[in-house]
C-alpha cells in the first residue's frame, strides 16, 4: 500500500509499505492492504512501517491518519 507521513515542516516518508501501525487515541491500530476507509486522531507515539527493506519507525506527537483506497496518509505533529 502507498504511505505518506507528513509534518508541517517536511515529508518524513513517501513510498510503499506492507503494513502500518499508528498510535491511535484508543490504542495502537494496524493497517494492511484493502483496509476499510477510516479517519482517526493520533496521540504521541511511534508510526511503524513494515517495508521491503525492514521496519521503519517515525516518532510523532499526535496528528490525524486517513486510510482510503490502499493509501495511508499520516498528517503528524
Role assignments for model-derived ranges:
Residues 2-77:
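Compact, glycine-rich, soluble single-domain proteins
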Amino acid at each position: 500500500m502507498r504511505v505518506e507521513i507528513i509534518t508541517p515542516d517536511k515529508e518524513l516518508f513517501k513510498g510503499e509499505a506492507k503494513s502500518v501501525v499508528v498510535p491511535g487515541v484508543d490504542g495502537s491500530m494496524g493497517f494492511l492492504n484493502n483496509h476499510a476507509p477510516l479517519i482517526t486522531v493520533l496521540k504521541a507515539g511511534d508510526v511503524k512501517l513494515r517495508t521491503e527493506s525492514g521496519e521503519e519507525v517515525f516518532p510523532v506527537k499526535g496528528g490525524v491518519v486517513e486510510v482510503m483506497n490502499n493509501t495511508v496518509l499520516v498528517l503528524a505533529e
